[in-house]
């Protein structure tokens, strides 16, 4: 879980464009965030398995 101070810091507008970074919209995790969904891999997998993301399903081959 992300610290509240880091989440608040991330929500401010960055002074320079290179300082901006992505965080998960659900848990605030800074790493392995999918930009298309705005979710980290953990939350993306959980929501996909619960059927909360339309059109996404578990792969099987």
Curated annotation (Swiss-Prot):
Which Pfam families does this entry report, sorted A to Z? Answer: Ribosomal_S14 (PF00253)
- PROSITE patterns registered for this protein in UniProt: RIBOSOMAL_S14 (PS00527)
Keywords of the record, alphabetical order, are: Metal-binding, Ribonucleoprotein, Ribosomal protein, RNA-binding, rRNA-binding, Zinc
Per the record, the domain of life is: Bacteria
Cofactors that this protein relies on: Zn(2+)
Gene Ontology biological process terms in this record: translation
Q: Is Ribonucleoprotein given among the entry's keywords?
A: yes
GO MF: rRNA binding; structural constituent of ribosome; zinc ion binding
Matching InterPro entries: Ribosomal_uS14, Ribosomal_uS14_bact, Ribosomal_uS14_CS, Ribosomal_uS14_sf
List of residues binding Zn(2+): 24, 27, 40, 43
Task: Quote the cofactor binding remark.
Answer: Binds 1 zinc ion per subunit.
Q: Hey, what's the signal peptide range on this chain?
A: none
Name the GO cellular-component terms. cytoplasm; small ribosomal subunit
Q: What family does the database annotate? A: Belongs to the universal ribosomal protein uS14 family. Zinc-binding uS14 subfamily.
What is the recorded function of this protein according to its Swiss-Prot or TrEMBL entry? Binds 16S rRNA, required for the assembly of 30S particles and may also be responsible for determining the conformation of the 16S rRNA at the A site.
The annotated subunit structure for this chain is: Part of the 30S ribosomal subunit. Contacts proteins S3 and S10.
NCBIfam families attached to this UniProt entry: PRK08061.1
State what protein this is by name: Small ribosomal subunit protein uS14
Q: Which organism is it from?
A: Sulfurovum sp. (strain NBC37-1)
């Amino acid at each position: 879980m992300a610290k509240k101070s880091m989440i608040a810091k991330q929500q401010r507008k960055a002074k320079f464009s290179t300082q901006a970074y992505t965080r998960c919209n659900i848990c605030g995790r800074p790493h392995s965030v999918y930009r298309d969904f705005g979710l980290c891999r953990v939350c993306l997998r959980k929501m996909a398995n619960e059927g909360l993301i339309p059109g996404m399903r578990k792969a099987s081959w």
